[in-house]
A protein has these predicted regions:
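Non-transmembrane, aqueous-exposed alpha-helical and coiled segments at domain scale
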Residues: 1-174
Length: 174
């Protein structure tokens, strides 16, 4: 009996990834899932990966619309979460073309976390309870105006992660 169970592990980076995979006539550009997505291979996101719940939600919808059976996505609870306000801050930063950021919120999220204004993946399942305060904290950190549409989309994406994908691994051993 073969007990081989493949798993793609992403150990760093974030949704700026854009690796294209092709298998049996199907093609997909991955940003959250790993390169085994078309083969049904689950992806594990290590604690150093930046996640954007909205990107995960949107990529899932694209995979489903392409008729792909979406494999599991395991997310370390310590992954740093990119909020819509991080994305806005990145895109508004006049140094975007000089600091190497791609405008996906990773640079702003990194800087925010470095300043101890954190939002980790372990909070996503509790978005109903904590998202308003967390988003206000991030919004204030970046000195941005409230955007209800983006906040609602963020909460919807966090709820999707919690209820539909059952992606969280409890524990921090990886």
């Amino acid at each position: 009996i073969n007990s081989y169970k493949p798993l793609v592990i992403r150990f760093s980076g974030g949704p700026q990834a854009g690796h294209r995979v092709v298998y049996k006539g199907k093609s997909h550009v991955c940003s959250s899932w790993g390169s085994g997505v078309l083969l049904g291979v689950p992806t594990c996101l290590y604690k150093e990966v930046f996640i954007d719940p909205i990107c995960i939600y949107n990529e899932y919808k694209v995979l489903v619309s392409e008729g792909i059976e979406v494999p599991k996505l395991y997310i370390n609870p310590n992954c740093r979460v990119i909020t819509p306000y991080d994305v806005l801050a990145d895109s508004m930063d006049g140094r975007v073309k000089y600091n190497g950021t791609c405008g996906k919120g990773i640079h702003a999220c990194f800087k925010r976390n470095k300043d101890n204004v954190t939002y980790s993946a372990r909070m996503c399942p509790y978005a109903d309870e904590y998202a308003d305060v967390a988003l206000q904290t991030v919004r204030d950190y970046h000195n941005l105006e409230k955007n209800i549409e983006l906040e609602n989309l963020f909460k919807e994406a966090c709820t999707f992660i919690k209820e539909h994908t059952q992606t969280f691994i409890i524990g921090t051993y990886y």
